[in-house]
A protein has these predicted regions:
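Short glycine- and Lys/Arg-enriched binding-loop motifs that mark or flank ligand-binding interfaces
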Residues: 227
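Glycine-rich, acidic/polar active-site loops that bind/position phosphate-bearing ligands
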Residues: 1-221, 230-233, 240-404
Length: 404
């Protein structure tokens, strides 16, 4: 048995070729020196395939002049930027014990499963990932028999093996279910820090395809593989958590009294309004542009949904300069003696908004199913960090903090 050596020096810095791939014009063809750097915040893992067992080490990839040639480097830079500015916000409100703020991400991965023998007969699916011609099926997604139906045994067997393979790789797969369109399904992982969530989602997409092959199926990650039914997206659930366990996007029971939350909310709304073009561009890949607004949500236009409770608080602040109350959800009475009455949430959940507040996080629903979630989070982190910085600069020099 051959034993290969791998030194600590090689772990910390590697030198792969940095010219033989598209770089958007960052590099001339002859400029070949690049560096990899170990991202020690994302655990290494062992991957077993036909070639044997491979040690996979998450790394950043930069050119000789420092240009980012990957999706990890900009993401880590954006996380560093929002950490710095969000920590300033915490300190302004007396939380001086906070030393670090980390963006948390939980992506929901949608996909289609079809028989592999039928897939191999469709050159359009093989070459483009979607059907280019064909007849509409006699039945599409008009009923709820698929979305709310029992998961078929064959699909359940696939999901079981997929979960097992992902957990072996350290990916915390949690939820799986049918989706709206026939043959469409979804897998969601437990939320974690942004760079780890991005790495995990790449593993999820790769593993989905491998496991599908073993079960005689093909996994389609194209955003719009079939006309007339829903396509596949990747909902990006995003929040900000301190090292002391505080979620900056938790409004609490009385949001109108939570001044820190209202400032954070205002900064996020300002960032999305000012840089809607960047946020839209972060989800712009050909397949996804074909999907957005076609027989499904979200539309291709950026808008924000904050819910009835927060919208009412915002209206109070705009009209009077202060907020005196917050709407409550009240009690839901089922009308059945054997079922309990229970407290409702303060607002309904908007399932179609591209950027919706969902209780203690924002859900960016535009990302395409085949795309990396890195770009969307780079933009989110960066534009919100900019808004935080502007707010912190004003508040730190204000003579009257409460008035400012």
């Amino acid at each position: 048995t051959a034993i290969m050596e791998f030194s600590g020096k090689e772990l910390i810095k590697g030198e792969p070729d940095a010219s033989s791939f598209p770089s958007g014009g960052l590099r001339a063809t002859f400029e070949a020196r690049g560096y990899t750097a170990w991202d020690c915040t994302s655990p290494a893992f062992l991957k077993k395939d036909a070639t044997g067992v491979t040690l996979c080490i998450p790394t950043a990839f930069c050119s000789y002049r420092g240009e980012a040639l990957d999706k990890k480097t900009p993401l880590l830079r954006s996380m560093q930027a929002i950490d710095k500015e969000a920590t300033r916000i915490f300190h302004l409100f007396g939380h001086t014990e906070v030393k670090r703020v980390t963006p948390s991400v939980g992506p929901e991965q949608e996909y289609f499963l079809i028989d592999r023998d039928k897939y191999l007969k469709r050159k359009d699916l093989i070459y483009t990932g979607r059907t280019l011609f064909g007849a509409m099926p006699p039945k599409g997604q008009e009923m709820d028999d698929h979305y709310y139906g029992v998961i078929r045994e064959r699909i359940g067997s696939y999901m079981k093996e997929l979960n097992e393979e992902l957990w072996k790789l350290g990916v915390t797969a949690k939820t799986q279910h049918n989706e709206v369109a026939p043959a469409q399904h979804e897998l969601a992982t437990i939320y974690t820090k942004a760079n780890l969530a991005v790495d995990h989602n790449q593993i999820v997409m790769e593993t989905m395809k491998k496991v599908a092959n073993r079960h005689g199926m093909a996994c389609l990650l194209h955003e719009k593989p079939f006309q007339g039914v829903n396509g596949s997206g990747k909902h990006n659930n995003w929040s900000l958590a301190s090292d002391t366990g505080i979620n900056m996007l938790d409004p609490g029971v009385t949001p109108h009294e939570n001044i820190q939350f209202l400032l954070v909310l205002a900064c996020i709304m300002k960032a999305v309004d000012r840089h809607a073009d960047l946020l839209r561009q972060s989800a712009a890949v050909p397949g996804n542009d074909f999907r957005l607004g076609a027989q499904e949500a979200p539309p291709a236009i950026i808008s924000i949904f904050v819910g009835e409770q927060l919208e009412d608080v915002i209206d109070q602040l705009i009209s009077t300069g202060s907020a005196t109350h917050s709407k409550t959800g009240g009690t839901l009475k089922t009308g059945v003696t054997t079922l309990p009455d229970f407290d409702k949430d303060a607002t309904d959940r908007n399932r179609t908004s591209p950027f919706a507040f969902t209780g203690n996080k924002f859900e960016f629903r535009m990302v395409g199913s085949s795309d990396s979630v890195s770009s969307a989070n780079v933009v989110l982190n960066t534009i919100v960090a900019e808004a935080f910085k502007e707010a912190a600069d004003e508040l730190e020099k204000a003579a009257d903090f409460d008035l400012a």
